[in-house]
């Protein structure tokens, strides 16, 4: 369990520091037992610290089982030095991805699989070669996935708990998911390598992929209780649940509950995978999967009573699994399942009235301020039925939305609540939060005003109060206002401090400074999408910037997004774009050769669609620096996006394209003349008169 793992982790650190402590490896079986005999001190400290941690029932048994399982873990052998060297070179070649075409890479992958035949389990459990196995799986076709899956059957209970093999299982499930509805052909394609098949022929698996997934469930059956909180198996269990449900499995998303945020994103750069369906889309699955999924979910939570199920909500390892279970129960099986007394959401929240000082209210309050539990509450707020959400909001959350928004942890739950509120409730919440916006800005909690603006725009709520609050939160000088919003002042101050002192004060926390800068940029980008007084806060600041500051913003990877959004936003008026775009005319070459500034130059193309003379002046400046642009990667992209070859050779076609007209469909897009519009009005009147006469004749 996590607490015991932490103790083992501390011992591992001591072993690394002191060579003499390596003898403890032989005594490793007895030490956890001794420490489990006196858990009261640790448990008391955990409760008083506000961690809301309740040990799961049978936790000591699970720890003993896990310790014993680690000692009795099957050993599949080690790769010899020649095999290690070969697979290391294969890993480097896949990483470089310097194959001539897809066929050359396919032949290389086939050769690696032939070399790995009979050693698949060794490679999956190898610290250095398990990464190769993950990459091989990601570039394999469905037939190779089918063969490898068959090799792992019978060993999944061991593999999912292994530090390295568990990631191979996760990648295998994701890659095999699109093929569960296919019947893999037992006749391997022999059209390219008939001769090799005679030498390397291997018996074909008898089971289709769907049946193989059923075998995985059978292997893990009866062990769900401790696998939920096993640090290596838990992320594989999450993937398995999503595959059985046919839900998207996206491990690359920051919002994903599939994998840890520290997980390595292994793959082949620019490589094509065997997946026909992207991992971000829902898939069709066999009918047997739904019944299996329902049984697996019931087995996972049936061994826990309500108290320990709630304790799982604040468990660092078990919480993400519980999030997946709640999401699947409410979204996959329908929100009507929440009415069943044995449902997970009903066991977590038995009292839908949320009365004061009730058990349910105390549980929700504990989740709100818990860094781990708040993520489960976000999932519940996003997925729970409308009736339950309204009761939660009106009976508990409504009166404290402003105070919750100021809290660093509970504020994220507030964002999910804002996404579900109607127009009237959203207007009431806005009136609560608006007075707190200055303090939120001061504490760099800009994500709350950002989401509030987005929801007000979506629901049609007036944003003038937000504009006034933001105006009072920043400097009255428009130029300094944007610098404060984008955190340019603090960045310049940090740089100056580093150069003057050349010490650690300037390097105190660069991660938080970058995060604040990013959130400030996102807030400014959202503001410029709102018409009226709100967007004028940024538009007026952009016009007040000095040329030097404007260029520095354009070259900043984070802040330049605000310039791009302001140029292309529907809220920007022609008057603003006419004044603002002229400030770039003498800096086109400098910006086009910069990695961030080139995107600003690209945004100037649609921004000047109704200001042709400015666009033509910019094109002339680009044409004068043709050689420099063609020698630069980003410069060539700008040259292509501005259609400069067309500008040099067929100026008339370029002019039509610059004005937003297509030459081939010019007749269809040509605006009507006054005579044409008069004829259309006359024809409409004639048709109305004819219709009236026909009605009178019938009467």
Swiss-Prot record:
Single GO biological process annotation from the record: endonucleolytic cleavage in 5'-ETS of tricistronic rRNA transcript (SSU-rRNA, 5.8S rRNA, LSU-rRNA)
Compositionally biased tracts (Acidic residues): 194-204
Biased composition (Basic and acidic residues): 1-27
Subcellular location: Nucleus, Nucleolus
Any single GO CC term annotated in Swiss-Prot or TrEMBL for this entry: 90S preribosome
SMART domains: Pumilio (SM00025)
Chief location: nucleus
Repeat positions for Pumilio: 115-150, 151-186, 359-394, 396-431, 544-581, 583-620
Region (Disordered): 1-47, 184-204, 494-514
Gene Ontology MF, one: RNA binding
Stored Pfam families: PUF_NOP9
Keywords on record: Nucleus, Repeat, Ribosome biogenesis, rRNA processing
Protein family according to the UniProt entry: Belongs to the NOP9 family.
Described purpose of this protein according to its UniProt entry: RNA-binding nucleolar protein required for pre-rRNA processing. Involved in production of 18S rRNA and assembly of small ribosomal subunit.
Official protein name in the record: Nucleolar protein 9
Gene designation: nop9
């Amino acid at each position: 369990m996590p607490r015991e793992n932490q103790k083992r982790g501390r011992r591992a650190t001591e072993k690394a520091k002191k060579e003499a402590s390596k003898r403890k490896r032989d005594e490793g079986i007895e030490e956890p037992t001794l420490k489990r005999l006196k858990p009261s001190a640790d448990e008391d400290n955990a409760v008083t610290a506000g961690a809301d941690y309740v040990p799961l029932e049978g936790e000591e048994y699970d720890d003993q089982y896990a310790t014993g399982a680690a000692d009795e873990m099957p050993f599949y052998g080690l790769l010899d030095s020649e095999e290690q060297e070969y697979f290391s070179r294969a890993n480097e070649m896949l990483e470089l991805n310097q194959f001539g075409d897809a066929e050359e890479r396919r032949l290389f992958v086939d050769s690696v699989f032939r070399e790995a035949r009979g050693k698949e389990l060794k490679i999956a459990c190898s610290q250095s070669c398990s990464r190769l196995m993950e990459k091989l799986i990601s570039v394999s076709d469905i037939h190779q996935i089918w063969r490898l899956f068959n090799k792992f059957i019978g060993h999944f209970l061991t593999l999912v708990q292994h530090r390295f093999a568990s990631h191979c299982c996760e990648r295998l499930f994701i890659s095999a998911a699109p093929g569960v509805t296919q019947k893999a052909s037992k006749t391997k394609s022999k059209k390219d390598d008939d001769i090799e098949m005679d030498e390397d022929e291997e018996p074909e698996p008898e089971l289709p992929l769907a049946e193989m997934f059923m075998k995985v469930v059978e292997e893990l059956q009866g062990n769900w209780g401790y696998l939920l909180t096993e640090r290596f198996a838990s992320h594989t269990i999450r993937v398995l649940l999503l595959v059985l449900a046919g839900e998207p499995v996206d491990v690359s998303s920051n919002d994903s509950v599939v994998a840890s945020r520290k997980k390595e994103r292994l793959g082949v750069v620019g490589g094509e995978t065997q997946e026909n369906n992207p991992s971000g889309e829902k898939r069709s699955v066999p009918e047997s999967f739904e019944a299996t999924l329902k049984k697996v979910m019931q087995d996972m939570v049936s061994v826990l009573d309500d108290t320990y199920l709630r304790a799982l909500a604040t468990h660092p390892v078990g919480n993400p699994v519980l999030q997946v279970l709640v999401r699947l129960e409410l979204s996959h099986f329908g929100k009507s399942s929440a009415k069943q007394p044995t449902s997970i959401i009903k066991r977590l929240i038995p009292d839908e009235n949320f009365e004061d000082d009730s058990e349910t209210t105390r549980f929700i309050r504990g989740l709100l301020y818990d860094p781990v539990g708040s993520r489960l509450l976000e999932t519940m707020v996003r997925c729970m039925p409308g009736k339950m959400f309204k009761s939660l909001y009106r009976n508990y959350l409504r009166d404290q939305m402003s105070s919750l928004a100021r809290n660093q942890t509970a504020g994220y739950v507030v964002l999910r609540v804002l996404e579900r509120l109607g127009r009237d409730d959203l207007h009431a919440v806005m009136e609560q939060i608006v007075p707190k916006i200055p303090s939120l800005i001061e504490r760099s909690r800009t994500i709350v005003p950002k989401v509030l603006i987005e929801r007000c725009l979506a629901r049609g709520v007036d944003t003038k109060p937000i504009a006034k609050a933001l105006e009072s939160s920043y400097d009255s000088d428009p130029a300094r206002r944007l610098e404060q919003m984008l955190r340019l002042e603090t960045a310049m101050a940090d740089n100056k401090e580093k150069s003057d002192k050349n010490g650690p004060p300037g390097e105190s926390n660069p991660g938080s400074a970058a995060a604040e800068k990013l959130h400030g940029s996102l807030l400014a980008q959202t503001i410029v999408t709102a018409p009226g007084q709100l967007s004028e806060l940024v538009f007026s600041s952009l016009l007040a910037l000095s040329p030097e500051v404007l260029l520095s913003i354009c070259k900043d990877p984070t802040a330049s997004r605000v310039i791009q959004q302001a140029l292309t936003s529907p809220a920007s008026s022609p008057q603003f774009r006419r004044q603002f775009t002229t400030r770039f005319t003498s800096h086109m070459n400098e910006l086009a050769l910069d990695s961030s500034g080139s995107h600003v130059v690209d945004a100037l193309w649609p921004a000047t669609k109704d200001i042709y003379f400015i666009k033509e002046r910019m094109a002339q400046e680009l044409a004068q620096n043709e050689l420099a642009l063609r020698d630069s990667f980003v410069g060539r992209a700008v040259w292509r996006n501005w259609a400069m070859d067309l500008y040099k050779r067929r100026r008339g076609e370029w002019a039509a394209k610059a004005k937003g007209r297509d030459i081939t469909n010019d007749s269809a897009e040509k605006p009507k003349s006054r005579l044409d519009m008069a004829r259309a009005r006359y024809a409409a009147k004639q048709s109305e008169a004819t219709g009236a006469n026909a009605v009178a004749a019938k009467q």
